[in-house]
Amino acid sequence: MSPRIAWALILHGDNPADAGWLRPDEAYRLRKRIETLSDDPDPAVRLQAWLANRADTHHLHAQDVPAVLKDERLVPSGISDPRSQMSAARRGEGYTRTDALEDLTLDHLLVPATPARSNFTLHVTAIMPMRPVPEVLLAADLADRGGPRETIRSGEVFQEWLTHQVGLR
């Protein structure tokens, strides 16, 4: 799924026509795809695949994770969202806009790191999600981490999101 379509799903869920940037045929196809999730035995895996292109992901090392998470140019997500029910005091995750990346990186002395050595996952996108991030975005971020606790919680959050979609209850 392209980033444009993925963000229509993230921000508008079962009403993709509300995304002013989709053509009517794209909104219709996205709505039909969402409807297939109610019959899917593992909708979390499918949604994770659909949302794979939602942002550019940077693995970084932060000197002061709490300070980065408090920065207004960042929206916490994944393990940093309280709804994740994860305890990640020394790690952080969040979204920032493409045009804020350079300043955020400089202000917090964020340096690139391998995924194994990073303590901050920064998702960079042209579309800034609201605070708190939509459930479907939280679930996708948790699924991307791949750990057993994150995977289980991701599935639970995806199910919660599905129950909120009109016509999929």
Where do the PLM segments sit?
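Basic, Lys/Arg-rich alpha-helical nucleic-acid-recognition elements, primarily the DNA-binding modules
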Residues: M1
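Phosphate-handling catalytic interfaces
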Residues: R4-W7, L11-R169
